[in-house]
Amino acid sequence: MPARKIILSNDIRVKPTENTLKIGTNKSVDIDGMKVTTLKSTDEGVAFIIEYKGKIIYHAGDLNDWYWEGEDEKENLRMRESYRHIIKKGFENIPKVDIAFLLVDPRQENECGCGTDFFLENVEAKHIFPMHFWGDHKRVEEYIRTRKENIYTITHTQQVFELEGLI
């Protein structure tokens, strides 16, 4: 396993240490055999694609289809197109990931999983963990019931999952 490093988006204001690496959008770095690639976010920071020992982990960060009911339709469609372009381009050579951390944000009401839906229509994911749901576990459970993919149900903060044989 590589030495421990803290990898942050370069727009986060913290004093770097020797174990901190700040990285901008659409960049790749290799850290002791672990490749970390970033994608531009549709909000703040970056999304991460991590490749290590033949496995791929995706963490969406704030990269999402931020479609807000009641907001300007032009802006919603611009955001949707931006998100879809970033996902298609970022994963054009990565058809499958082992773990995906994807947004299911109940503040988006009926569109709470639209970014996750698009991602899963375009990228196969073995293990899917919803995030960014502001403690609204019931809304996430409702969303999961509508999907056929292997989306893990998260019932409380700091819940631990063990995935056998991943690395």
Briefly describe each language-model feature range.
Residues 19-96, 159-167:
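Core dinuclear metal-dependent hydrolase active-site scaffold
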Residues 1, 69, 110-113:
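Active-site-adjacent loop/helix micro-motif of nuclease/hydrolase catalytic cores
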Residues 1-29:
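Active-site HxH/HxHxD metal-binding segment of metal-dependent hydrolases
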Residues 17-28, 42-44, 112-167:
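Binuclear metal-ion centers of metallo-dependent hydrolases, dominated by the metallo-beta-lactamase
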Residues 1-4, 93-94, 119-124:
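Short, conserved loop/helix-junction motifs that constitute active-site signature segments
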Residues 65-67, 106-109:
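Short acidic, S/G/P-rich loop/turn micro-motifs used as interaction or catalytic elements
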Residues 84-90, 108-118:
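A short, acidic, amphipathic alpha-helical segment used as a generic capping/interface helix at domain edges
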Residues 1, 5-11, 58-61, 77-81, ...:
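Active-site neighborhood of phospho(di)ester-bond hydrolases with catalytic His/Asp-centered motifs
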